[in-house]
Amino acid sequence: DMEVLPVFDDEAVVAKAHSVTAALIQKHPDVAVIAGFDGSSGGGICPAVREAGKSGTIKVVMNDILPAHMECLKEGTAQYIVGQKRHIFGPIALQTLYDINHSGISFTERDGELGIYPAPDKVDPGFLVVTQDNFEDMDAMVKNLEKL
């Protein structure tokens, strides 16, 4: 049997993520997976898991490919980091703006008046998933970003 626990809000505060995670582990010592969906969550989750002596036992999934999160993965406290493909945000935006102004594609004779543009309404650039298997490549990417 598996029990799914309620969502706990750390309010994007590392210290709160730490205290919430520590309390969660104390109340549910057999918890199998903890996921943090805010960039600040991992910075509190990993130390709490480590302090409880549960590194590697509790699977940790974090959001945002940050240096601190990479350290958690490297040491084995976290197993997965999910991050946006930020490198392509700018190029996609520029291409979209260019297409709106220069594509020559129209749907009606009054596209501009009707708010119709030759571009997608939503763009999903996708995600990167960092694991031990691709750690070295993703770590190099993070270190290159730090130089900018």
Predicted regions and their residues:
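A generic structural signal for alpha->beta connector loops
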Residues: D1-V4, T57, T77-A78, G126
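Hinge/cleft segment of the Venus flytrap/periplasmic-binding protein
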Residues: I92-L148
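Short helix-capping segments at alpha-helix termini
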Residues: D1-M2, Q26-D30, R50-T57
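Amphipathic, non-transmembrane alpha-helical secondary structure
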Residues: A15-H18, A22-Q26, G43, P47, ...
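Hinge/beta->alpha junction and helix N-cap segments in small-molecule ligand-binding domains
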Residues: D1-V20, A35-S41, D64-A68, Q84-F89
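Beta-strand segments within the central parallel beta-sheet cores of soluble alpha/beta enzyme folds
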Residues: L5-P6, K59-V61, G112, V123
